[in-house]
Amino acid sequence: MFWADKIAADAQINQVVNDSKTPSGRVHVGSLRGVVIHDVIDRALKHGGKSSKFLYGVDDYDALDTVPHYLDREKFAPYLGFPLCNVPSPDNSASDYAKYFMGEFLEVFEHLGVRPEVYYLRDLYRSGRLNSYIDTFLKNAHLVREAYLEVSKARRPDNWYPFQIACENCGKIATTVVS
């Protein structure tokens, strides 16, 4: 039995297949691996008579942490630490940096016949839909610190929280400390 058909046969009804990417620059062709695997699973579920929804998230609220070599460093260096959705597009073809690079990648989806429902994390954060989950994580930060220690042996300080917030003054997300 094909591996995806096995997954579909073992699955319950109403499955959500989800993948995501941080568009910090040109997306490497290797990132298509997850896209194709998730698409195959979604198709196998549907072929097997299961209800399935294929989602693809764009983590555009992650910070710009480096300027790719193919971009103008002088233009983009001032945006280091800003959420990708708040960094200008390399040209006028997109509203911002994240949409520019995701647009390139999503064009490849079309050529492959992969059609997930695409969502942007900026929209989830700004709409407040994640607020209750953020609150839960902040209230249980000690458990998240314990998980980091157990899984990756990474010790986080007691004042570390599993959340990055944009500074109200400078707009950066990478250097702001939650308190």
What is the meaning of each model-derived region?
Residues 32, 36, 125-127:
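Acidic-and-aromatic substrate-binding clefts and catalytic sites of carbohydrate-active enzymes
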Residues 55-64, 121:
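Short, solvent-exposed turn/loop segments enriched in Gly/Ser/Thr/Pro and often Arg
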Residues 29-32, 96:
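Alpha-helix capping and helix-loop boundary segments enriched in small/acidic/polar residues
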Residues 25-26, 62-65, 126-129:
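Short catalytic/ligand-binding loop motif for oxyanion handling, primarily in non-cytosolic enzymes
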Residues 83-179:
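Active-site neighborhoods of enzyme catalytic cores
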Residues 61-79, 133-134:
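Charged, often glycine-rich, active-site loop that binds/positions anionic groups
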Residues 1-29, 40-56, 76-77, 81, ...:
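Non-catalytic terminal extensions that flank enzyme cores
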